[in-house]
């Protein structure tokens, strides 16, 4: 990973045209040659970037300036010294580097002019193990299966990922009365999740060996619209407290 801190400007051309005026910014250049430009404030997203596959080259600023001069003279736009230096470039002086990044699959070009470089360092970050997500639906499913009485006292687990013709139900259990309960689990429960649970329950209730099958819609958060729809369909909503399920002291359970 190459990290450059510099006063820079940038021009992007291709599918769209965009420019960044001269300012102090951070540039990240990855091993795949992708380049990202960041500012101090604003979004976590870069101001401009070129992603792989791409090719990056360092252009000699003097050669670029000379080429620009020849093109200006050939075009008859201006003559003399004014052809080579605008008032802004005279004030700023010659840039230290020019980076040109070209898309390998297209005509897009990002050209970054580094007017003054404060730092230019390269680091070997090694192989990254990747992001390990905590609190995803699979974790919620596993914890709820291990603590199945959260859906009701006396409940027993039948199995996780209970197979059906239209896809697996997250959890199938039986309640204290011995009736089957299908549990659909989401991190953030919306109307789509309730509709999914509805399809499962309608299918499962056609099987005389399983019916009646009740439905529980379980999530860390459930939208008000989803709560209303679930209640209308005869389902129970269960709010899952992930920290609690991992073993924190608060063992409260909210059913509504």
UniProtKB/Swiss-Prot annotation:
Official protein name in the record: Endonuclease NucS
Family recorded in the similarity comment: Belongs to the NucS endonuclease family.
Annotated stretches, region: Disordered: 62-97
List the GO cellular component terms: cytoplasm
Q: Which organism is it from?
A: Bifidobacterium longum (strain NCC 2705)
- Where, subcellularly, is it found? Cytoplasm
Q: What is the lineage of its organism?
A: Bacteria, Bacillati, Actinomycetota, Actinomycetes, Bifidobacteriales
- UniProtKB keywords: Cytoplasm, DNA-binding, Endonuclease, Hydrolase, Nuclease
Q: Which HAMAP family does this UniProt record tie to the protein?
A: NucS
Describe the function of this protein: Cleaves both 3' and 5' ssDNA extremities of branched DNA structures.
């Amino acid at each position: 990973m190459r990290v450059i801190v510099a006063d820079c400007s940038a021009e992007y051309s291709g599918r769209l045209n965009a420019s960044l005026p001269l300012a102090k910014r951070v540039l990240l250049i990855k091993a795949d040659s992708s380049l990202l430009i960041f500012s101090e404030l604003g979004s976590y997203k870069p101001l401009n970037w070129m992603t792989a596959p791409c090719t990056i080259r360092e252009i000699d600023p003097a050669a670029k300036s000379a080429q620009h001069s020849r093109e200006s003279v050939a075009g008859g736009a201006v003559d003399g010294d004014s052809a080579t230096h605008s008032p802004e470039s005279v004030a700023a002086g010659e840039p230290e580097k020019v980076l040109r990044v070209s898309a390998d699959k297209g005509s897009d070009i990002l050209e970054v002019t580094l007017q003054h470089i404060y730092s230019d360092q390269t680091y070997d970050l090694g192989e990254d193990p990747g992001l390990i997500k905590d609190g995803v639906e699979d974790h919620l499913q596993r914890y709820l299966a291990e603590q199945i009485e959260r859906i009701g006292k006396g409940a027993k687990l039948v199995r996780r990922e209970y197979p059906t013709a239209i896809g697996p139900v997250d959890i199938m259990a039986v309640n204290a009365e011995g009736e089957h309960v299908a549990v659909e689990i989401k991190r953030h429960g919306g109307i789509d999740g309730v509709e999914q649970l509805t399809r499962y329950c309608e299918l499962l209730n056609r099987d005389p060996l399983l019916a009646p099958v009740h439905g529980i819609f379980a999530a860390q958060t459930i939208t008000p619209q989803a709560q209303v729809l679930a209640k209308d369909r005869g389902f129970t909503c269960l709010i899952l407290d992930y920290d609690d399920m991992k073993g924190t002291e608060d063992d409260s359970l909210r059913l509504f």
